[in-house]
Amino acid sequence: MNDNQELILKGRYTAYMEQIEKYYNGTIDRTQPIVIGMTTNALAISGADSSLELTINIKTLNKCIGSPDDIYHGHLLDRNIIEQLPFQLENPVMIFKNTEKHSLICITDLQDSSGHGVMVAVALEQINHQHTVNRISSLYGK
């Protein structure tokens, strides 16, 4: 059993995986963000508030998996990358401050279909449906 499976078995990301399944089978509430979990220690060490949930909006997820032919600036990431997201944010290769204020960039060890490393942009302390969260604002290969 790998570390990812152990985390799932412990229930830490079970709700996230259920939401991703609903997203892909079309039964998710598209008006609500997907909750990945609490902000990871790695992000907290880099300046994120660890008491906040980490989320991704459906619109952002659509852009991340969409084809550039179908969605403006679609990133065409496959489902496996989306499913690995929480685990990659637990232990990213590197985190640095983005040029955007109140934002971090996480470098993962995942690769997109073109062989580019996958990066995750996290906007810190964002208001989302009247709650403050740390929100994934983009996920792409570069």
Task: Kindly label every feature range from the protein language model.
Residues 1-142:
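Ribonuclease/tRNase effector modules and their secretory precursors
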